[in-house]
A protein has these predicted regions:
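Small/polar-rich, solvent-exposed N-terminal microdomains that initiate assembly or binding
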Residues: 1-93, 198
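Extracellular/virion structural assembly segments
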Residues: 2-20, 95-101, 107-146
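Residue-identity detector for threonine
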Residues: 4, 12, 25-29, 41, ...
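Acidic-leaning, charged glycine-interspersed low-complexity segments
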Residues: 30-41, 125-187
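Short, solvent-exposed beta-strand/turn "edge" segments of beta-rich domains on protein surfaces
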Residues: 83, 90-98, 169-173
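Residue-level signal for well-ordered alpha-helical segments
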Residues: 89-93, 118, 122-124, 157-161
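Oligomerization/assembly interface segments of phage tail-like spikes and tubes
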Residues: 98-113, 173-188
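Protruding loop/beta-arch "assembly-hinge" segments enriched in small, turn-prone residues
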Residues: 187-198
């Protein structure tokens, strides 16, 4: 069975929405913690461009940039998920249909303390405050994926996924943040396109 045409995009939108809600929920309970970025929250194609990390679009908006992107799509199997399958397809026999694995990248950027206009480095207090925001963001994004991903599949046991490494990125260009990878199983549920054999 093949994937439905919107299988990937619908999942990326669901992950984006889930993480955004989690960031806003955390901001409501942790003093001084920013919520979901107001202006730059989107699914992006390919590698993430660091377009904005500090510019809110209004005085009441939250700055930053939250993105979800696809790193890769590949064949796997029920037994070996998330390992890449090396089974040859299209041969006769009773091989189970392959499972499709999708590696997603969730990236969250915030403003990083930088040098002052007089060339002085950021203070330890500024660095500590930025670290606190980053550390809370790291836990929030991780927990959001753990809690939301099972509910994105309408199966009895929920969606299968494997949390990948989370790493800090930056500071660079006034931005600092995190990148969280997660590999998700996409079960096929669409028929293969009709086509006559050559």
């Amino acid at each position: 069975m093949a994937l439905t045409p919107l299988a990937i995009h619908d999942l990326t939108e669901a992950v984006l929405g889930c993480v955004c809600v989690a960031l806003d929920t955390t901001a409501a309970t942790v003093d001084g913690q920013p919520g979901c970025p107001s202006c730059r929250t989107c699914v992006v194609p390919g590698a993430v461009a660091w377009d904005s990390c500090d510019d809110p679009c209004s005085d009441t908006a939250t700055g930053g940039q939250l993105t979800v992107s696809v790193a890769r799509l590949y064949a796997s199997s029920d037994v070996d998920f998330p390992a890449e399958s090396s089974s040859v397809q299209g041969v006769r026999g009773c091989l189970p249909p392959p499972m499709t694995a999708l590696e997603l990248v969730v990236t969250l950027l915030r403003c990083a303390p930088t040098f002052t206009e007089h060339g002085c480095p950021p203070s330890c207090e500024e660095l500590s405050a930025a670290s606190r925001v980053l550390h809370v963001d790291m836990v929030t994004v991780y927990n959001a994926l753990l809690c939301c991903l099972p509910g994105t599949e309408q199966r009895r046991r929920g969606r299968r996924f494997v949390m990948g490494a989370q790493r800090t990125i930056g500071p660079q260009g006034g931005c600092v943040g995190l990148e969280q990878r997660v590999t998700v199983a996409l079960p096929g549920c669409a028929p293969c396109p009709d086509r006559e054999s050559p």
